[in-house]
Protein backbone atom coordinates (compact mmCIF):
# COMPACT_ATOMS: atom_id res chain seq x y z
CA UNK A 1 0.00 0.00 0.00
CA UNK A 2 2.84 2.38 0.94
CA UNK A 3 4.68 1.75 -2.36
CA UNK A 4 1.46 2.39 -4.30
CA UNK A 5 1.09 5.79 -2.59
CA UNK A 6 4.69 6.74 -3.35
CA UNK A 7 4.22 5.84 -7.04
CA UNK A 8 0.99 7.84 -7.18
CA UNK A 9 2.64 10.89 -5.63
CA UNK A 10 5.50 10.70 -8.16
CA UNK A 11 3.03 10.59 -11.07
CA UNK A 12 1.05 13.50 -9.68
CA UNK A 13 4.26 15.50 -9.18
CA UNK A 14 5.21 14.79 -12.80
CA UNK A 15 1.83 16.08 -14.00
CA UNK A 16 2.22 19.24 -11.89
CA UNK A 17 5.19 20.23 -14.08
CA UNK A 18 2.74 20.92 -16.91
CA UNK A 19 0.16 22.94 -14.97
CA UNK A 20 -1.18 26.08 -16.62
CA UNK A 21 -3.37 28.92 -15.39
CA UNK A 22 -6.36 27.15 -16.95
CA UNK A 23 -5.73 24.16 -14.67
CA UNK A 24 -5.98 26.34 -11.56
CA UNK A 25 -9.19 27.83 -12.92
CA UNK A 26 -10.42 24.29 -13.55
CA UNK A 27 -9.61 23.32 -9.97
CA UNK A 28 -11.55 26.34 -8.71
CA UNK A 29 -14.60 25.43 -10.81
CA UNK A 30 -14.32 21.84 -9.57
CA UNK A 31 -14.51 23.02 -5.94
CA UNK A 32 -17.53 25.20 -6.75
CA UNK A 33 -19.26 22.22 -8.38
CA UNK A 34 -18.93 19.86 -5.40
CA UNK A 35 -22.11 20.86 -3.55
CA UNK A 36 -24.25 21.01 -6.74
CA UNK A 37 -22.85 17.57 -7.62
CA UNK A 38 -24.00 16.11 -4.31
CA UNK A 39 -27.48 17.55 -4.79
CA UNK A 40 -27.65 16.39 -8.41
CA UNK A 41 -26.48 12.88 -7.54
CA UNK A 42 -29.34 12.57 -5.04
CA UNK A 43 -31.77 13.82 -7.69
CA UNK A 44 -30.72 11.32 -10.36
CA UNK A 45 -30.84 8.46 -7.85
CA UNK A 46 -34.39 9.38 -6.88
CA UNK A 47 -35.32 9.57 -10.57
CA UNK A 48 -33.42 6.32 -11.26
CA UNK A 49 -31.43 8.02 -14.03
CA UNK A 50 -28.06 7.13 -15.48
CA UNK A 51 -25.86 9.73 -17.16
CA UNK A 52 -23.30 9.08 -19.87
CA UNK A 53 -21.04 12.04 -20.62
CA UNK A 54 -19.31 12.12 -23.99
CA UNK A 55 -16.65 14.36 -25.50
CA UNK A 56 -13.68 14.65 -27.83
CA UNK A 57 -11.32 17.61 -27.94
CA UNK A 58 -13.18 20.50 -26.32
CA UNK A 59 -13.68 22.32 -29.63
CA UNK A 60 -14.55 19.34 -31.85
CA UNK A 61 -17.27 16.85 -32.66
CA UNK A 62 -15.85 14.88 -35.59
CA UNK A 63 -14.57 11.64 -34.15
CA UNK A 64 -15.72 8.50 -32.34
CA UNK A 65 -17.32 10.59 -29.61
CA UNK A 66 -19.90 12.32 -31.79
CA UNK A 67 -20.57 9.11 -33.72
CA UNK A 68 -21.34 7.22 -30.51
CA UNK A 69 -23.38 10.17 -29.19
CA UNK A 70 -25.44 10.13 -32.40
CA UNK A 71 -26.01 6.39 -32.06
CA UNK A 72 -27.21 6.68 -28.46
CA UNK A 73 -29.62 9.45 -29.40
CA UNK A 74 -31.02 7.31 -32.20
CA UNK A 75 -32.11 4.58 -29.77
CA UNK A 76 -35.78 4.75 -28.93
CA UNK A 77 -35.66 2.50 -25.87
CA UNK A 78 -32.50 3.99 -24.35
CA UNK A 79 -33.17 5.19 -20.79
CA UNK A 80 -29.79 6.87 -20.44
CA UNK A 81 -29.36 10.63 -20.29
CA UNK A 82 -26.52 11.43 -22.68
CA UNK A 83 -24.67 14.74 -22.80
CA UNK A 84 -22.00 15.96 -25.18
CA UNK A 85 -19.42 18.40 -23.80
CA UNK A 86 -18.14 20.98 -26.27
CA UNK A 87 -17.01 24.60 -26.36
CA UNK A 88 -19.93 26.80 -27.39
CA UNK A 89 -17.61 28.68 -29.78
CA UNK A 90 -16.82 25.49 -31.68
CA UNK A 91 -17.82 25.41 -35.36
CA UNK A 92 -19.34 21.99 -34.61
CA UNK A 93 -21.57 23.17 -31.76
CA UNK A 94 -24.73 23.79 -33.79
CA UNK A 95 -24.61 20.31 -35.33
CA UNK A 96 -24.16 18.65 -31.93
CA UNK A 97 -27.05 20.66 -30.52
CA UNK A 98 -29.32 19.23 -33.22
CA UNK A 99 -28.49 15.68 -32.12
CA UNK A 100 -28.97 15.83 -28.34
CA UNK A 101 -28.15 17.49 -25.04
CA UNK A 102 -25.08 19.70 -24.94
CA UNK A 103 -23.06 21.05 -22.02
CA UNK A 104 -20.41 23.78 -22.22
CA UNK A 105 -16.95 22.27 -21.89
CA UNK A 106 -15.29 23.13 -18.57
CA UNK A 107 -18.41 24.71 -17.05
CA UNK A 108 -19.78 24.03 -13.56
CA UNK A 109 -22.47 21.81 -15.07
CA UNK A 110 -19.83 19.89 -17.02
CA UNK A 111 -18.10 19.18 -13.70
CA UNK A 112 -21.41 18.17 -12.13
CA UNK A 113 -22.12 15.72 -14.94
CA UNK A 114 -18.55 14.43 -14.84
CA UNK A 115 -18.77 13.69 -11.11
CA UNK A 116 -22.28 12.21 -11.29
CA UNK A 117 -22.05 10.26 -14.54
CA UNK A 118 -22.00 6.50 -14.74
CA UNK A 119 -19.45 6.71 -17.56
CA UNK A 120 -17.25 9.50 -18.89
CA UNK A 121 -16.72 8.52 -22.52
CA UNK A 122 -14.10 10.17 -24.72
CA UNK A 123 -11.96 9.69 -27.81
CA UNK A 124 -9.24 11.72 -26.07
CA UNK A 125 -7.08 10.60 -23.17
CA UNK A 126 -7.67 13.95 -21.48
CA UNK A 127 -11.41 14.01 -22.06
CA UNK A 128 -12.31 15.66 -18.77
CA UNK A 129 -13.50 19.16 -17.74
CA UNK A 130 -9.88 19.80 -16.80
CA UNK A 131 -7.13 17.34 -17.71
CA UNK A 132 -4.88 17.87 -14.68
CA UNK A 133 -7.63 17.82 -12.04
CA UNK A 134 -9.27 14.84 -13.73
CA UNK A 135 -5.96 12.98 -13.76
CA UNK A 136 -5.72 13.26 -9.97
CA UNK A 137 -9.40 12.43 -9.36
CA UNK A 138 -9.32 9.30 -11.48
CA UNK A 139 -6.56 7.87 -9.33
CA UNK A 140 -9.15 7.68 -6.55
CA UNK A 141 -11.10 4.38 -6.36
CA UNK A 142 -14.47 6.15 -6.46
CA UNK A 143 -13.71 7.70 -9.87
CA UNK A 144 -11.64 4.92 -11.40
CA UNK A 145 -14.55 3.02 -12.97
CA UNK A 146 -15.79 5.93 -15.06
CA UNK A 147 -13.45 6.60 -17.98
CA UNK A 148 -14.24 4.85 -21.28
CA UNK A 149 -11.55 5.41 -23.91
CA UNK A 150 -13.04 5.32 -27.42
CA UNK A 151 -9.64 6.22 -28.88
CA UNK A 152 -8.80 8.79 -31.52
CA UNK A 153 -7.02 6.29 -33.75
CA UNK A 154 -5.80 2.71 -33.74
CA UNK A 155 -2.77 2.33 -31.47
CA UNK A 156 0.23 1.26 -33.55
CA UNK A 157 3.23 2.08 -31.38
CA UNK A 158 4.65 1.33 -27.95
CA UNK A 159 2.81 4.23 -26.29
CA UNK A 160 3.75 4.19 -22.61
CA UNK A 161 1.30 6.96 -21.78
CA UNK A 162 -1.50 4.49 -22.60
CA UNK A 163 -0.27 1.82 -20.18
CA UNK A 164 -2.92 0.90 -17.62
CA UNK A 165 -0.75 2.10 -14.73
CA UNK A 166 -0.66 5.54 -16.36
CA UNK A 167 -4.24 5.75 -17.61
CA UNK A 168 -6.47 3.69 -15.28
CA UNK A 169 -9.09 3.53 -18.04
CA UNK A 170 -12.15 1.48 -17.15
CA UNK A 171 -12.30 0.37 -20.75
CA UNK A 172 -9.84 0.64 -23.65
CA UNK A 173 -11.73 0.09 -26.92
CA UNK A 174 -9.73 -1.31 -29.84
CA UNK A 175 -10.46 -0.94 -33.53
CA UNK A 176 -8.45 -3.88 -34.93
CA UNK A 177 -7.61 -7.43 -33.89
CA UNK A 178 -3.76 -7.13 -33.88
CA UNK A 179 -4.04 -3.89 -31.92
CA UNK A 180 -6.22 -5.59 -29.30
CA UNK A 181 -3.79 -8.49 -28.93
CA UNK A 182 -0.78 -6.16 -28.66
CA UNK A 183 -2.31 -3.78 -26.12
CA UNK A 184 -3.70 -6.62 -24.03
CA UNK A 185 -0.31 -8.34 -23.88
CA UNK A 186 1.89 -5.28 -23.33
CA UNK A 187 -0.08 -2.45 -21.72
CA UNK A 188 -1.20 -4.15 -18.50
CA UNK A 189 -4.97 -3.88 -18.80
CA UNK A 190 -7.13 -6.37 -16.86
CA UNK A 191 -9.13 -8.66 -19.15
CA UNK A 192 -12.44 -6.83 -18.77
CA UNK A 193 -10.79 -3.42 -19.19
CA UNK A 194 -9.97 -3.91 -22.87
CA UNK A 195 -12.17 -5.07 -25.75
CA UNK A 196 -12.08 -5.33 -29.53
CA UNK A 197 -15.38 -3.68 -30.42
CA UNK A 198 -14.46 -1.45 -33.37
CA UNK A 199 -14.67 2.33 -33.65
CA UNK A 200 -18.01 4.14 -33.80
CA UNK A 201 -16.90 6.17 -36.80
CA UNK A 202 -16.35 2.95 -38.76
CA UNK A 203 -20.12 2.43 -38.96
CA UNK A 204 -20.48 4.85 -41.87
CA UNK A 205 -17.44 3.69 -43.82
CA UNK A 206 -18.85 0.64 -45.56
CA UNK A 207 -21.51 2.68 -47.32
CA UNK A 208 -19.24 5.55 -48.39
CA UNK A 209 -18.58 6.27 -52.04
CA UNK A 210 -15.21 7.26 -53.45
CA UNK A 211 -14.75 10.73 -54.80
CA UNK A 212 -12.19 9.67 -57.39
CA UNK A 213 -10.98 13.19 -58.13
CA UNK A 214 -9.63 13.80 -54.62
CA UNK A 215 -6.41 12.85 -52.82
CA UNK A 216 -5.84 13.65 -49.16
CA UNK A 217 -2.40 14.51 -47.75
CA UNK A 218 -2.68 14.06 -43.99
CA UNK A 219 0.66 14.07 -42.11
CA UNK A 220 0.86 13.56 -38.37
CA UNK A 221 2.46 15.90 -35.83
CA UNK A 222 5.99 16.04 -34.49
CA UNK A 223 6.41 16.16 -30.74
CA UNK A 224 9.77 17.91 -31.00
CA UNK A 225 8.37 20.86 -32.95
CA UNK A 226 4.80 21.00 -31.66
CA UNK A 227 3.90 23.20 -28.71
CA UNK A 228 4.59 21.93 -25.22
CA UNK A 229 1.51 20.18 -23.86
CA UNK A 230 0.38 17.51 -21.43
CA UNK A 231 1.29 14.73 -23.89
CA UNK A 232 4.87 15.85 -24.31
CA UNK A 233 7.98 14.84 -22.39
CA UNK A 234 10.34 15.82 -25.22
CA UNK A 235 10.24 19.41 -26.39
CA UNK A 236 12.45 21.40 -28.72
CA UNK A 237 11.79 25.11 -29.03
CA UNK A 238 11.46 25.98 -32.69
CA UNK A 239 11.47 29.76 -33.08
CA UNK A 240 11.10 29.56 -36.86
CA UNK A 241 8.93 26.71 -38.09
CA UNK A 242 10.03 27.32 -41.69
CA UNK A 243 13.51 26.07 -40.78
CA UNK A 244 12.24 22.64 -39.81
CA UNK A 245 12.61 19.57 -41.97
CA UNK A 246 8.87 18.95 -41.58
CA UNK A 247 7.99 22.28 -43.16
CA UNK A 248 10.53 22.05 -45.96
CA UNK A 249 9.60 18.50 -46.98
CA UNK A 250 5.88 19.25 -47.22
CA UNK A 251 6.44 22.64 -48.82
CA UNK A 252 8.60 20.86 -51.39
CA UNK A 253 5.83 18.33 -52.03
CA UNK A 254 3.12 20.98 -52.35
CA UNK A 255 5.17 22.83 -54.96
CA UNK A 256 6.63 19.89 -56.85
CA UNK A 257 6.24 20.38 -60.60
CA UNK A 258 5.95 16.63 -60.97
CA UNK A 259 3.02 16.48 -58.54
CA UNK A 260 1.35 19.61 -59.87
CA UNK A 261 1.43 18.28 -63.45
CA UNK A 262 0.14 14.88 -62.31
CA UNK A 263 -2.83 16.51 -60.60
CA UNK A 264 -3.54 18.85 -63.51
CA UNK A 265 -3.30 16.16 -66.20
CA UNK A 266 -5.67 13.87 -64.31
CA UNK A 267 -8.06 16.61 -63.14
CA UNK A 268 -7.36 15.78 -59.49
CA UNK A 269 -7.51 17.81 -56.29
CA UNK A 270 -5.11 17.26 -53.40
CA UNK A 271 -6.24 18.39 -49.95
CA UNK A 272 -3.40 19.10 -47.49
CA UNK A 273 -4.76 18.61 -43.97
CA UNK A 274 -2.01 18.30 -41.31
CA UNK A 275 -2.62 17.06 -37.77
CA UNK A 276 -4.45 19.51 -35.53
CA UNK A 277 -1.28 20.03 -33.43
CA UNK A 278 0.38 21.36 -36.59
CA UNK A 279 -2.58 23.41 -37.84
CA UNK A 280 -1.28 26.54 -36.12
CA UNK A 281 1.53 26.54 -38.71
CA UNK A 282 -0.87 26.21 -41.64
CA UNK A 283 -0.41 29.77 -42.90
CA UNK A 284 3.30 29.18 -43.44
CA UNK A 285 2.51 26.67 -46.21
CA UNK A 286 1.81 27.77 -49.76
CA UNK A 287 1.45 26.33 -53.24
CA UNK A 288 1.40 27.57 -56.81
CA UNK A 289 -1.18 24.99 -57.86
CA UNK A 290 -4.92 25.61 -58.13
CA UNK A 291 -5.37 21.84 -57.77
CA UNK A 292 -4.04 21.87 -54.20
CA UNK A 293 -6.08 22.99 -51.19
CA UNK A 294 -4.40 23.87 -47.89
CA UNK A 295 -7.18 22.90 -45.50
CA UNK A 296 -8.02 24.58 -42.21
CA UNK A 297 -9.53 22.18 -39.68
CA UNK A 298 -12.21 24.74 -38.86
CA UNK A 299 -13.55 24.47 -42.40
CA UNK A 300 -12.95 20.82 -43.27
CA UNK A 301 -14.39 17.76 -41.55
CA UNK A 302 -11.79 15.02 -41.31
CA UNK A 303 -14.29 12.15 -41.59
CA UNK A 304 -15.78 13.62 -44.75
CA UNK A 305 -12.32 14.02 -46.25
CA UNK A 306 -11.55 10.38 -45.54
CA UNK A 307 -14.81 9.14 -46.98
CA UNK A 308 -14.61 11.30 -50.11
CA UNK A 309 -10.96 10.74 -51.02
CA UNK A 310 -9.51 7.95 -53.14
CA UNK A 311 -5.84 7.93 -52.07
CA UNK A 312 -4.16 8.99 -48.83
CA UNK A 313 -0.62 10.21 -48.34
CA UNK A 314 0.41 10.28 -44.69
CA UNK A 315 3.51 9.43 -42.66
CA UNK A 316 2.89 7.58 -39.40
CA UNK A 317 -0.68 8.61 -38.66
CA UNK A 318 -3.13 5.93 -37.56
CA UNK A 319 -5.74 7.71 -39.67
CA UNK A 320 -4.31 5.55 -42.47
CA UNK A 321 -6.08 2.61 -40.86
CA UNK A 322 -9.42 4.32 -41.41
CA UNK A 323 -8.53 4.40 -45.08
CA UNK A 324 -7.50 0.77 -44.95
CA UNK A 325 -10.84 -0.10 -43.34
CA UNK A 326 -12.48 1.28 -46.49
CA UNK A 327 -9.98 -0.72 -48.60
CA UNK A 328 -8.44 2.39 -50.12
CA UNK A 329 -4.73 2.80 -50.97
CA UNK A 330 -2.31 4.51 -48.57
CA UNK A 331 1.19 5.93 -49.10
CA UNK A 332 3.41 6.44 -46.02
CA UNK A 333 5.91 9.22 -46.81
CA UNK A 334 8.47 8.72 -44.00
CA UNK A 335 11.36 11.10 -44.61
CA UNK A 336 12.30 11.29 -40.90
CA UNK A 337 11.67 7.73 -39.74
CA UNK A 338 14.75 7.35 -37.52
CA UNK A 339 14.16 10.58 -35.63
CA UNK A 340 10.45 9.88 -35.23
CA UNK A 341 11.21 6.56 -33.55
CA UNK A 342 13.84 8.11 -31.31
CA UNK A 343 11.99 11.25 -30.27
CA UNK A 344 8.30 10.38 -30.42
CA UNK A 345 6.96 6.83 -30.60
CA UNK A 346 8.85 3.57 -30.22
CA UNK A 347 8.00 0.90 -32.76
CA UNK A 348 5.16 -1.39 -31.78
CA UNK A 349 3.57 -4.40 -33.45
CA UNK A 350 2.72 -2.56 -36.67
CA UNK A 351 5.30 -2.69 -39.45
CA UNK A 352 4.42 -0.13 -42.11
CA UNK A 353 6.47 -1.96 -44.75
CA UNK A 354 5.24 -5.52 -44.25
CA UNK A 355 1.68 -4.84 -43.05
CA UNK A 356 0.18 -4.91 -46.53
CA UNK A 357 -1.87 -1.84 -45.59
CA UNK A 358 0.05 0.68 -47.66
CA UNK A 359 3.36 1.48 -49.35
CA UNK A 360 6.28 3.18 -47.55
CA UNK A 361 8.37 5.83 -49.33
CA UNK A 362 11.30 7.93 -48.12
CA UNK A 363 11.75 10.34 -51.02
CA UNK A 364 9.61 12.84 -52.88
CA UNK A 365 10.06 11.11 -56.25
CA UNK A 366 9.09 7.70 -54.92
CA UNK A 367 6.00 9.16 -53.27
CA UNK A 368 4.77 10.76 -56.49
CA UNK A 369 5.63 7.65 -58.53
CA UNK A 370 3.54 5.44 -56.23
CA UNK A 371 0.70 7.95 -56.36
CA UNK A 372 0.88 7.88 -60.17
CA UNK A 373 0.69 4.10 -60.10
CA UNK A 374 -2.43 4.11 -57.92
CA UNK A 375 -4.08 6.60 -60.27
CA UNK A 376 -3.28 4.45 -63.30
CA UNK A 377 -4.68 1.33 -61.61
CA UNK A 378 -7.97 2.94 -60.68
CA UNK A 379 -7.15 3.45 -56.98
CA UNK A 380 -7.35 -0.27 -56.27
CA UNK A 381 -5.26 -2.09 -53.65
CA UNK A 382 -3.38 -5.27 -54.56
CA UNK A 383 -4.59 -8.79 -53.89
CA UNK A 384 -1.99 -9.22 -51.14
CA UNK A 385 -3.11 -5.99 -49.48
CA UNK A 386 -6.72 -7.14 -49.61
CA UNK A 387 -5.87 -10.40 -47.82
CA UNK A 388 -3.82 -8.64 -45.12
CA UNK A 389 -6.59 -6.09 -44.76
CA UNK A 390 -9.11 -8.82 -43.92
CA UNK A 391 -6.75 -10.22 -41.28
CA UNK A 392 -6.22 -6.84 -39.64
CA UNK A 393 -9.93 -6.04 -39.51
CA UNK A 394 -11.40 -9.44 -38.68
CA UNK A 395 -14.70 -7.67 -37.94
CA UNK A 396 -15.89 -5.23 -40.59
CA UNK A 397 -19.49 -4.06 -40.37
CA UNK A 398 -21.72 -1.16 -39.30
CA UNK A 399 -22.39 -2.52 -35.80
CA UNK A 400 -19.45 -0.96 -33.95
CA UNK A 401 -21.49 1.53 -31.91
CA UNK A 402 -23.97 -1.18 -31.07
CA UNK A 403 -21.22 -3.43 -29.73
CA UNK A 404 -19.80 -0.61 -27.61
CA UNK A 405 -23.24 0.16 -26.18
CA UNK A 406 -23.95 -3.48 -25.32
CA UNK A 407 -20.52 -3.91 -23.73
CA UNK A 408 -20.95 -0.83 -21.56
CA UNK A 409 -24.27 -2.18 -20.34
CA UNK A 410 -22.54 -5.45 -19.44
CA UNK A 411 -19.87 -3.80 -17.23
CA UNK A 412 -22.17 -1.55 -15.23
CA UNK A 413 -21.21 -1.55 -11.59
CA UNK A 414 -18.16 -3.74 -12.16
What positions do the PLM features span?
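Membrane-proximal basic amphipathic "stem/tether" segments
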Residues: 1-56, 232
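C-terminal amphipathic helix plus adjacent low-complexity
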Residues: 4-13, 37, 268, 358, ...
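Active-site and donor-binding regions of nucleotide-sugar-utilizing enzymes
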Residues: 51-205
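Conserved catalytic-core segment of nucleotide-activated headgroup transferases in glycan assembly
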Residues: 63-69, 200-284, 361
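Short active-site oxyanion
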Residues: 79-83, 167-172, 269-270, 308-311, ...
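Donor nucleotide-activated moiety binding/catalytic core segment of transferases
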Residues: 104-112, 276-321
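A short, gly/pro- and small-residue-rich
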Residues: 133-153, 233-247, 328-339
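Catalytic binding pocket for nucleotide-activated donors in carbohydrate/polymer assembly enzymes
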Residues: 285-287, 316-392
Amino acid sequence: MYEWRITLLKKIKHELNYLKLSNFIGAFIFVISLIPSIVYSIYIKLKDKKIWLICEDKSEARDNGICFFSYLNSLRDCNIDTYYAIDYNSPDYSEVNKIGKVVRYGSVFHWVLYLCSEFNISSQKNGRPDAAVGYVLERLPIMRKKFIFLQHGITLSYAKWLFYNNSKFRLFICGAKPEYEYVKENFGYPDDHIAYLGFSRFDAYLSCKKKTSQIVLMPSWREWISSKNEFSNIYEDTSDFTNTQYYNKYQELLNSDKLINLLKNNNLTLVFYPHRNMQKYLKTFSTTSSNIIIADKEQYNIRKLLMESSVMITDYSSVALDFAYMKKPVIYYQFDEARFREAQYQKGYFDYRSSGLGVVTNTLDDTINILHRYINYGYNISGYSSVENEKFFSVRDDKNSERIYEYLLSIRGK
